[in-house]
Amino acid sequence: MVDGIADIDGRRMRYSVSDNLDASTWAVNLHSYMAGGGVYWRESSRLAGRLGLRVINPNLPGFSGSEPLPWDLLRMSTFAEGLTRILDHLGAPTALVLGHSMGAAVAIQFAHDFPERTLGVVYRDGVATSSWKHRHGLWSRLLGPLVPDLGTALDFLAAFATDLPDLAWSRITSLVATAAPDLRLNARSFTATLPVAAMLLACDYTAITTAVGEAGEIPILPMWGRFDRIVPPATGREFGELVGRPVQWVLGGHLWMIPRPATQLNVLRYDEAGMAFMEQVRDRARLLKRPAA
């Protein structure tokens, strides 16, 4: 993966891109909240090397060195529009979009706003539908009547803690080398990321999700960690029903692709649903290349 910087309406946006220049199909791998493109380098490198995709890992506005959006532009549609500028910057007419958690919501917004540039969406443990915000943990029950926001925040932290043992199975030295710079930058610019968290908690993208599903034009592959406690399996089933696609359940929690970066590749190469999805992506790529009648 090679680092780069793009100018998006006068704001600096950092990204990395695989160096397989002969690849004919582009892909974008969108990160979760408080992460960055570097966290997904190992996964993207496998997708580039084995599937022949030219993979872009952007750092979304406010994260990992990319400049934040001003308050008046802080909305999901602006995030999606920024992706088109990255694609233009790199000369990519269309792309397969993979999104994790917050990035999955951005992926759905991109598919809704720019279907002509979307080859397909791999939606992973995403927050585009509202049920992920309905917390039923101990802290929400104890503090909900008095300070509901605090109860929700503590529940999210407790849910995140359940993923930490899973990360221990990762190749720690490799993970630290790729993820640490992004996490360090995010820690230093925490005030820039807090407004994004507020946006995610305040907004509901169910209508956009429903519209993309009802249109039926774009291939969608929902994937979910079986033991996800941050965005629970019920939210995965909700999303699958809205878009009319079965959810592919994988081993792990919310961060399943980080300790096991080969999982996504294996699903797309060897799983029946993943192979069917990739065939639909190739069909759509051929369709979008055809001249208008």
Residue ranges and their predicted role:
Residues 11-67:
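Conserved HGGG/HGGXW glycine-rich cap/lid loop of the alpha/beta-hydrolase fold
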Residues 54-98:
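Active-site loop/oxyanion-hole signature of alpha/beta-hydrolase fold enzymes
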Residues 99-103, 107:
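Gly/Ala-rich beta-loop-alpha elbow adjacent to hydrolase catalytic centers
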Residues 112, 119-152:
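Flexible "cap/lid" loop of the alpha/beta hydrolase fold
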Residues 132-134, 152-215:
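Conserved alpha/beta-hydrolase catalytic His-Asp/Glu region
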Residues 216, 222-224:
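Short beta-strand/loop motif that positions the catalytic acidic residue
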Residues 226-231, 255:
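Acidic catalytic loop of the alpha/beta-hydrolase fold
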Residues 244-293:
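Catalytic active-site module of serine/aspartate enzymes centered on a nucleophile-bearing elbow/loop
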